[in-house]
Amino acid sequence: MGKISSLPTQLFKCCFCDFLKVKMHIMSSSHLLYLALCLLTFTSSATAGPETLCGAELVDALQFVCGDRGFYFNKPTGYGSSSRRAPQTGIVDECCFRSCDLRRLEMYCAPLKPAKSARSVRAQRHTDMPKAQKEVHLKNASRGSAGNKNYRM
């Protein structure tokens, strides 16, 4: 009985092998090369990890990651650090000479600047405008009285 049950599997293997032989014969070498490149690209991009970035590629990556905040080439140091410093490593040392990831790039982004609220801008404009108008009014008034001419505002 073992031979009878294995007969369909042998038949399937034979037919499948014949099918592959025909398909491989029809497929040209350029198709095989294209298929191999697609498979390599897919497998390498799926497992992409840290990579080295130098020159314009490094700057482009920092601009993309940091956006409008900007970035530093050296890590910003805190206030009150001792006068004896260890040699600083910059983004070039970390990402060009060695590989770095997205988190490492983000460490070199400048901090977000606190945005002024709309209310404080309105309050500032409100206090600035009368002062400027008052100065113009005083200048025009002094001209008008000195030259006996009537100036209109």
Curated annotation (Swiss-Prot):
Residues 120-153 are annotated as: Disordered. Residues 111-118 are annotated as: D. Residues 90-110 are annotated as: A. Keywords: Cleavage on pair of basic residues, Disulfide bond, Growth factor, Secreted, Signal. Gene3D superfamilies: Insulin-like. InterPro entries: IGF-I (IPR022341), Insulin-like (IPR016179), Insulin-like_growth_factor (IPR022350), Insulin-like_sf (IPR036438), Insulin_CS (IPR022353), Insulin_family (IPR022352). Disulfide bonds join 54-96, 66-109, 95-100. Residues 119-153 form a propeptide. GO terms for molecular function: growth factor activity; hormone activity; insulin-like growth factor receptor binding. It is found in: Secreted. PANTHER family: INSULIN-LIKE GROWTH FACTOR I. Forms a ternary complex with IGFR1 and ITGAV:ITGB3. Forms a ternary complex with IGFR1 and ITGA6:ITGB4. Forms a ternary complex with IGFBP3 and ALS. This is Insulin-like growth factor 1. It comes from Rhinopithecus roxellana. The gene is IGF1.
